[in-house]
């Protein structure tokens, strides 16, 4: 370790040190024992357990996560070259696991999984859409964005623009303002077109959910579509229509896609037209909970394949129980509506709804519906959203396909 480092020092508890040694990148405020030097929010600090250096990270006294570790190499200098190397490493990984159209439309930076805590970057062709939930990264974004552009210039796929989707509520916990817009004052259209699994989509980077599209379900859509041939499909929580479009393109007899958002339904309809699938998909703007309840009352068993892709019902441990009830309600109703031998694709995108809890919920719903679940596939997020085993927060998506028997 270099003897002279220009950073303030903090002493952390043995519990925090153990967590860092195990590879987790967070230090909580109540794990800081003492400090040496001025602690400036957004600055880099060195973390020590006694005299043993544990890593360097961004400090924020206003956040529950007081330090987000960005390096465990004491020789690192945090300049543009550092961020260039970090981003290049992430991009080369995506070039390995995502090829062709998949690389042109994927997550480039997945926060902690790419050693850039609190930073998300999704690519839609020549547009990058970013979200920052770390004060230190926000203060260094000019250097980071230049490095991002330089990396894509090097691989011969230059970026036209960077759109900042910094309207996520998590920023308020970091003391950051909410805003969205083109970085650097650029003025490009906020609607762009992508191709995924051979399906063309219009993506609204300004108003769409997340950064405009649910990239993490890329290969789950392919898996769901594989068994859709000749099926009558009910696609619930359709958003931009992706699951339904994949099913229709793969030979489904007919698809009904449902979403409570009229804006999402209109976007999904436009995507169907874009792919010449409008005659094979009906779109319904309705609350899925109410729709399933009404179908049950009418004893409507016309669908032999139901897809449930709900938004995250919980974003904290405090609401896991109520979220579990919501997940169970829609899955129980779907199981009761399906004929024996019908198919169910179901998922949860909440980290706090663990795989164990999700499986228990599904088992409980199956018991109440008096059915058995024959598992076809158990899946997770696409590899451009990598999971680090020592950072459980990076593991959040559960996706199952069953035959109901």
What residue ranges belong to the model's regions?
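Non-catalytic accessory regions of SAM-dependent methyltransferases
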Residues: 1-125
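Non-catalytic substrate-recognition/targeting regions of SAM-dependent transferases
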Residues: 109-122, 141-213
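Conserved SAM-binding loop of SAM-dependent methyltransferases across substrates and taxa
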Residues: 226, 240-253
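Conserved class I S-adenosyl-L-methionine
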Residues: 230-239
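Conserved SAM-binding motif I beta-strand of class I
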Residues: 254-259
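S-adenosyl-L-methionine
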Residues: 263-307
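C-terminal catalytic and target-recognition region of SAM-dependent MTase-like enzymes
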Residues: 302, 329, 343-405
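Mobile active-site "lid"/loop adjacent to the S-adenosyl-L-methionine
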Residues: 304-333
């Amino acid at each position: 370790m270099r003897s002279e480092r220009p950073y303030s020092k903090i002493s952390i508890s043995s519990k925090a040190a153990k967590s860092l040694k195990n590879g987790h990148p967070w230090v909580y405020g109540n794990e800081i024992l003492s400090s040496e030097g001025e602690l400036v929010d957004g600055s880099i600090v060195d973390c020590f357990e006694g005299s043993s250096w544990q890593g360097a990270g961004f400090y924020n006294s206003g956040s529950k996560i007081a330090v987000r570790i960005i390096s465990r190499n004491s020789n690192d200098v945090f300049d543009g070259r550092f961020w260039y190397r970090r981003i290049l490493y992430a991009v080369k990984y995506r070039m390995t696991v995502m090829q062709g159209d998949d690389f042109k439309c994927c997550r480039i930076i997945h926060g902690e999984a790419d050693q850039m805590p609190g930073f998300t970057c999704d690519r839609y062709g020549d547009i990058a859409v970013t979200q920052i939930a770390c004060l230190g990264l926000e203060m260094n974004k000019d250097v980071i964005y230049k490095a991002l552009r330089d990396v894509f210039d090097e691989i011969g796929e230059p970026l036209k623009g960077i759109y900042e989707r910094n309207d996520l509520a998590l920023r308020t916990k970091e003391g950051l303002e909410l805003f969205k817009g083109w970085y650097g004052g650029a003025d490009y259209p906020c609607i762009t077109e992508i191709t995924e699994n051979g399906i063309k989509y219009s993506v609204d980077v300004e108003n769409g959910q997340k950064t405009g599209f649910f990239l993490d379900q890329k290969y789950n859509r392919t898996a769901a579509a594989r068994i859709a041939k000749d099926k009558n499909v009910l696609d619930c929580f359709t958003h931009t229509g992706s699951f339904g479009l994949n099913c229709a393109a793969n030979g489904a007899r007919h698809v009904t896609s449902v979403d409570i958002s009229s804006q999402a339904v209109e976007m999904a309809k436009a995507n169907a037209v874009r792919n010449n699938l409008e005659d094979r998909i009906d779109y319904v703007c309705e609350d899925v909970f109410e729709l399933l309840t009404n179908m049950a009352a009418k004893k409507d068993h016309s669908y032999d394949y139901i897809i449930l892709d709900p938004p995250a019902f919980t974003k904290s441990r405090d609401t896991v129980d109520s979220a579990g009830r919501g997940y169970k309600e829609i899955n129980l109703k779907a199981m009761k509506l399906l004929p024996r031998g019908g198919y169910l694709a179901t998922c949860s995108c909440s980290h706090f709804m663990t795989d164990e809890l999700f499986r228990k919920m599904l088992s409980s719903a199956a018991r109440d519906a008096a059915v058995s679940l024959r598992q076809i596939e158990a899946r997770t997020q696409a590899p451009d959203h990598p999971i680090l085993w020592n950072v459980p927060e990076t593991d959040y998506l559960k996706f199952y396909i069953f035959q109901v028997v």
